[in-house]
Amino acid sequence: LYTEKYIRDIYISNPKRALQLLDEAETRKAFPLRLINELRSLSYRNMYMNKLAFMYARKSYLLDSISQREPKHMLKMTVYLAELSSIMSKYNESMHYALSGIMQAQKLKDREAEARLLFCIGENNWRLSLKDEAYNYFGRTIELLRGSKDMREMMLLSYYYGAEMGFLMTDSRIDEALALAYEREKLLKKLEKVPEVPKATLMVNIAIYMQIWPIFLI
């Protein structure tokens, strides 16, 4: 019950139970505190309690920063902090984490982290009405992931296609959104043939796509 794997498996479906187990795991010193705080952050984020999610991601980040032993985990926490800052409309703070994280992601050759941080910067710029900069970063994100055969990167690309389509439609850039819709449709067909893609996750992607697609058929 108090293992990292078990709690990581349940925090989405039962975040409150995960938090109870994490308290006990900390008391028992069942696994490293940086991971306990990461899972607390994820559990709170899953409940949309973003301030607490940020607080525990920050605690985990600081532990990594002090030890300097787990650069990959520190990068993961940097991504969380950039995204959570953006969600809370702290755009300058988000930019700080994202820009420092991109350098680390490139050093570690972590394309998933780099893509998440690039898109986060794009979202920040869009919300600050810096639209040209925003679409530049969205484009960089998609170019980084386009053509990847890695399942996680393909799923991430599908999500970013959908997210940018939403921004384009809000800005009445319908032709560009339509072009992305076609690209996403092709990607979803490829994902259907990847055996390790969870079917439930794929169906969610298709459902989101189908919610957007009818707009272009009106």
Model-assigned labels for residue ranges:
Residues L1-I218:
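A "functional boundary" signal
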